[in-house]
Amino acid sequence: NATMIVALGNHDSAPSDVAAPSNLPDGLADQLSWDWDNVAALVKSEGWGDNVTSEKIRTHYGGYSISPRQGLRVISLNTDMWYRKNPFSYLNIDNPDPSHMLRWLTDELQAAEDNNERAWIVGHVLPGWDGGDSIDNPTNLLYHIVSRFSHTIAHSFFGHKHEDMFHVWYESQSGNSSSVSRETQNARAMAFIGPSITPLSNVNPSLRVYHVDPETYEVMDYSQYYTQLYDFEKLNKTGPVWELLY
């Protein structure tokens, strides 16, 4: 049986793009707790996780960790916490982790290291300094975390861009973009950035099947599929036909 892993995107809240850290005063932190409650209830009702998983989702902004196979820990993050369109990202901006989500990620990676597990990090908005998606301070801290646990992290997986991309994590010396040496010998990990099912941004819907080593949990290859939007009108009774792209 396949295990469903849920990772919240920036359109999975109402209003969109918003996630509030739990340390806001005057009850402001609770204004989106209904979202985490709904996700927790969905995961439990669909059998994608147990009571422990459901409680993690409630207390980590929709994020959680799960071990679908022996030796593998999957850590799902709510990446709206570093998304540039989230207005709450700019409160206490000098603090790279006001939500303590990255502290929790570090704890999960430490537990994986202690248990000789490999880890997958799953999220929506990818980190980076291009100014397009994520703010700098959380990105700086996340690079430090990945550098520290690069031997434990098998891979990370993101989306959001609606395009077929990849991201290389490099050794971070002092936690800012200018200190990162983008030389081959300083590469520490990589992230797969999958294209989207939605045709938004004028793309054909796509899906990806990863081929994974069952011992190391490294991705050895993947198959990229797509379906032609032009064919949808004549497929209204059968659904899309997926074709192998490469």
Regions flagged by a language model, labelled:
Residues V18-D35, G132-V146, S174-S178, F192:
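Short, electropositive alpha-helical surface patch
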Residues G9, L77, L105, I121, ...:
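Divalent metal-coordination and catalytic microenvironments
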Residues R84-R103, Q110-F158, V168:
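Active-site-proximal segments of metal-dependent phosphoesterases and phosphodiesterases across multiple
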Residues N10-S13, L126-P127, F157-D164, P195-T198:
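Catalytic metal-binding/acid-base residues of hydrolase active sites
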Residues S16-A19, D130-I135, M165-Y170, V203-P205:
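A short acidic (Asp/Glu
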Residues N1-P21:
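Core catalytic region of metal-dependent phosphoesterases/phosphodiesterases
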Residues G27-A111, N115, E163-Y246:
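Metal-dependent phosphoesterase/phosphodiesterase active-site architecture
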Residues A2-T3, H151, N186-A189:
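A short helix->loop->beta-strand "cap" motif at the edges of active sites that frequently abuts
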